[in-house]
């Protein structure tokens, strides 16, 4: 949740999910990540799919309930078959992310397996005892599931990229341990991605340059351009810029000038730098945390939530 003012409270997950639900944007992201920007996945072929992959696992006498809900899931007809495409939005580094995504994919396969087994049982068409016991006929096949994790954080991802990065493996066992490599995209390190959709290109380009403080580049590209206020809201949400979010909300449903918003962003950055310096200096001199929090609230006109967020970030 980003609390920008007394009246504006923005839920990050909701903003990002709404942005990616658009088929053209969703398809462009997957094409850029999986197919080097080639138009393989067609927006018109995408359908909404159930995001809830939760399941009940039964192992012997033990039963375990697992819950997994992806942010956005689409089904796509690829050739003559179907592909399930999942998207996970991540604001912070997560040191268990490969395992989380692997479990999500596995639950997706389990869900389809159980649906097929249920249908087979109802129809009762078995060619062998083995098919009956497994609930799965020899010719039955699951559809591939591809999940992408988009990391929106300002820090470079220094967590694991694959399951084996999370394991302590003796050298001799490494070649025989099954791995799971996640499809991770970092917004701040996304220059190599070839986007075709202008909305996706704008969000990644502006957010990346804000993270890297390349304000001059943003001014050069967007000086004469206005962007949709929805994109401004997404960019402000990704970069956690309260001024940019407020600027976008004031023009809801309209267009906004990025250069004007950029000036507000610079001013916000200057104020944050002052707050950071004050907090760190006060901590160095042994000033009580609660006194510092009260002081920045009073000096910079912050509400309690904003002051607490700065304290958490810089104390």
Which residues are covered by each model-predicted region?
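Elongated, amphipathic alpha-helical interaction scaffolds
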Residues: 1-315
């Amino acid at each position: 949740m980003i609390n920008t003012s007394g009246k504006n409270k923005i839920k990050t997950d909701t903003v990002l999910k709404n942005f990616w639900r658009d088929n053209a944007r969703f398809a462009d992201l997957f094409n850029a990540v999986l197919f080097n920007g080639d138009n393989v996945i067609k927006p018109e072929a995408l359908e909404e799919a159930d995001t809830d992959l939760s399941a009940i696992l039964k192992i012997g006498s033990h039963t375990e309930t697992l819950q997994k809900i992806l942010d956005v899931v689409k089904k796509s007809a690829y050739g003559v078959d179907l592909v399930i495409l999942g998207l996970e939005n991540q604001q912070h580094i997560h040191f268990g992310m490969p395992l989380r995504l692997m479990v999500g994919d596995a639950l997706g396969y389990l869900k389809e397996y159980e649906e097929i087994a249920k249908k087979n049982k109802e129809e009762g068409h078995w060619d062998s005892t083995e098919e009956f016991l497994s609930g799965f006929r020899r010719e039955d096949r699951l559809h591939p599931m591809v999940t992408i994790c988009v990391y929106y954080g300002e820090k470079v991802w220094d967590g694991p990229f694959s399951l084996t990065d999370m394991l302590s493996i003796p050298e001799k066992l490494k070649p025989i341990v099954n791995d799971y490599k996640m499809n991770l995209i970092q917004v701040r390190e996304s220059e190599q991605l070839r986007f075709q959709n202008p909305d996706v290109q704008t969000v990644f380009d502006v957010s990346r340059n804000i993270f890297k403080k390349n304000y001059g580049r943003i001014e050069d590209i967007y000086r004469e351009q206005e962007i949709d206020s929805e994109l401004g809201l997404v960019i402000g949400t990704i970069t956690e810029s309260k001024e940019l979010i407020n600027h976008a909300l004031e023009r809801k449903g309209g267009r906004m000038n990025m250069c004007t918003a950029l000036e507000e962003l610079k001013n916000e950055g200057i104020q944050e730098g002052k707050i950071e310096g004050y907090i760190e200096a006060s901590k160095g001199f042994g000033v009580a945390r609660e006194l510092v929090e009260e002081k920045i609230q009073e000096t910079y006109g912050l509400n309690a939530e904003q002051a607490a967020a700065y304290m958490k970030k810089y104390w």
